[in-house]
Amino acid sequence: MKIALSLGSNKGDRNKNLFLAIRELLDRKLVSNIVCSTLFENKALLLPGAPVDWDMDYINCAVVGETHLNPEELLKNIKDIEGFLGRKSIVKWSPREIDIDILYYDTLQVQSESLVIPHVEMLERNFVMLPLKEVMPQWKYNGKGKYCGYTIEEIVREKYGA
């Protein structure tokens, strides 16, 4: 199955964290035939009243590839990698060594307690959409709402002018 992931880091050696996460995806044979976008640096999203020291820039990228795992198995393995690379159970939007989100899983739509595919907030995040446009511009968004059926390229052009 073809998948797309979003990876981000804003704590520690951000570039190394992204590299190690991709290496773990490959070494653990979770994802094959990987194509990775360029790296994008962006400001952290913060909740109102968040501590000032949480305001650390992220580096993000998108990765597409193929997996033999079902979505829940993939999510479990991704959480294992995040823990292996130092991520703790943390407060929402706090700094993290690594954050890996499943954006897309072939043509599946998933809505469970632990997982929503396509990722529910992806369209509102330029740091997800711009890297994704590099690696799968012609993928047609199959989520709900106005942009269902639009390609990633069309969505990025309309929402972000890029």
Language-model region placement:
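Short hydrophobic/aromatic beta-strand micro-patches
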Residues: 6, 64-66, 105
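Extreme N-terminal starter segment of soluble prokaryotic enzymes
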Residues: 1-5
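Short, surface-exposed acidic-centric catalytic microdomains
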Residues: 20-70
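Acidic donor-diphosphate engagement hotspot in glycosyltransferases and nucleotidyltransferases
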Residues: 17
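Flexible, gly/pro- and Lys/Arg-enriched active-site loops
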Residues: 13, 45-49, 53-59, 69, ...
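N-terminal regions immediately upstream of nucleotidyltransferase
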Residues: 6-7, 42
